[in-house]
């Protein structure tokens, strides 16, 4: 993350990399604490949008969730924005995208929150998630995808992190990792089709992004990931949707498929793609690493997670790539840091191996 704590921590990266090269691939790598598995819930897409999250919410203390919402909003939202958005939401509720707005209303009714608070906390995440995402191909042509999600408010959000299977007609449509009360997705998998993660591309203040969403009808970043997981039939369709749909903020979308060379980093402007960066394994580019900075630009020394990740992947080697070794790469400091909420590794060709670990658990 681009914070003073992480910037200072990055000075130890060279020592960490030296240790990395001394470790065997079978040994655990530089974990501060043992990670934990988040709870798994089913969300029925056959249920009414207002009701579909309630079975999951019943496993959580409403007071704790409300306190987390208040913390995020209080830290991220100026009071004048809160008052203005409260008025706007009431006027334009019918124009906000479905089923997301109805789902947020159902969550708010259960938690005794206003719709404005629910919309605000969902949009507040849109421009605050620092991350590392990797898509890679092994020597047999198998595609692997991993991500760390770094975010403030870790003490609360680690307790609200969950894996969710979205089910329709008794079948799993897609699997994702999210926070309780949050209807968008930053990490997800459509089985036997594709995987997606989103990384923040820091441009503009987030409340400007929110206003754009409400006034222009553009899609929030995380809502488009969920829409793509719901509707896209294959890797190519997913890439097209993620590249072309107007957004409320800039972002990096990382997509993995099921066939050789099906891996890409999409650098997004609000209006469309700024760059498409695919895997090119025939020319030695068997992985792509994205860490919140345009790949064609040097990363700032204060927040260089890219170089340690690349060195760890090269130390691993294409022939030894697997979900397990990719998890190890994502566990190397400062790729893994004090702000890391969770790590997910996934492969759409092997959907049952989707795995999330909560990091830095208290």
From Swiss-Prot:
InterPro entries: Acid_ceramidase-like, Acid_ceramidase_N. It is found in: Lysosome; Membrane. The lineage of its organism: Eukaryota, Metazoa, Chordata, Craniata, Vertebrata. Its main location: other. The keyword Cell membrane does not apply. It is a peripheral membrane protein. GO terms for molecular function: DNA-binding transcription factor binding; fatty acid amide hydrolase activity; hydrolase activity, acting on carbon-nitrogen (but not peptide) bonds; N-(long-chain-acyl)ethanolamine deacylase activity; N-acylsphingosine amidohydrolase activity. It comes from Rattus norvegicus (Rat). GO terms for cellular component: cytoplasm; lysosome; membrane. Belongs to the acid ceramidase family. It catalyses: N-hexadecanoylethanolamine + H2O = ethanolamine + hexadecanoate; an N-(long-chain fatty acyl)ethanolamine + H2O = a long-chain fatty acid + ethanolamine; N-dodecanoylethanolamine + H2O = dodecanoate + ethanolamine; N-tetradecanoylethanolamine + H2O = tetradecanoate + ethanolamine. This is N-acylethanolamine-hydrolyzing acid amidase. Stimulated by DTT. Polysorbate 20 (Tween 20) is inhibitory. Stimulated by endogenous phospholipids such as choline- or ethanolamine-containing phospholipids, and dihydrolipoic acid.
């Amino acid at each position: 993350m681009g914070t003073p704590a992480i910037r200072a921590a990055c000075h130890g990266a060279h020592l960490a990399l030296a240790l990395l090269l001394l470790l065997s691939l079978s040994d655990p790598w530089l974990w501060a604490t043992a990670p934990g598995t988040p709870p798994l819930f089913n969300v029925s897409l056959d249920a009414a949008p207002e009701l579909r999250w309630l079975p999951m919410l019943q496993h959580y203390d409403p007071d704790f969730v409300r306190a987390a919402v208040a913390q995020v909003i209080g830290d991220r939202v100026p009071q004048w924005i809160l008052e203005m958005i409260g008025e706007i939401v009431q006027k334009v509720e019918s124009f906000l995208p479905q089923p997301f707005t109805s789902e947020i209303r159902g969550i708010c009714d259960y938690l005794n929150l206003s719709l404005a608070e629910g919309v605000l906390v969902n949009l507040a995440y849109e421009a605050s998630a620092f991350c590392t995402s990797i898509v890679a191909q092994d020597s047999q042509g198998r595609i692997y995808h991993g991500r760390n999600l770094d975010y403030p408010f870790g003490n609360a959000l680690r307790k609200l992190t969950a894996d969710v299977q979205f089910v329709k007609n008794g079948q799993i449509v897609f699997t994702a990792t999210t926070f309780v009360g949050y209807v968008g997705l930053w990490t997800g998998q459509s089985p036997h089709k594709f995987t997606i993660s989103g990384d923040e591309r820091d441009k503009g203040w987030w409340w400007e992004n929110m206003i754009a969403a409400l006034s222009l009808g553009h899609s929030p970043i995380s809502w488009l990931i969920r829409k793509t997981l719901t509707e896209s039939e294959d890797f190519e369709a997913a890439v097209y949707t993620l590249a072309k749909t107007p957004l409320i903020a800039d972002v990096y979308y990382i997509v993995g498929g099921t066939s050789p060379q099906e891996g890409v980093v999409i650098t997004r402007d609000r209006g469309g793609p700024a760059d498409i960066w695919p895997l090119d394994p025939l020319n030695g580019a068997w992985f792509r690493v994205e860490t919140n900075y345009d790949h064609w630009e040097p990363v700032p020394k204060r927040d260089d997670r890219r170089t340690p990740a690349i060195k760890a992947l090269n130390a691993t080697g294409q022939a030894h790539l697997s979900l397990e070794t990719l998890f190890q790469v994502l566990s190397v400091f400062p790729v893994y840091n004090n702000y890391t909420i969770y790590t997910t590794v996934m492969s759409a060709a092997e959907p049952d191996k989707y795995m999330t670990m909560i990091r830095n658990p208290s």
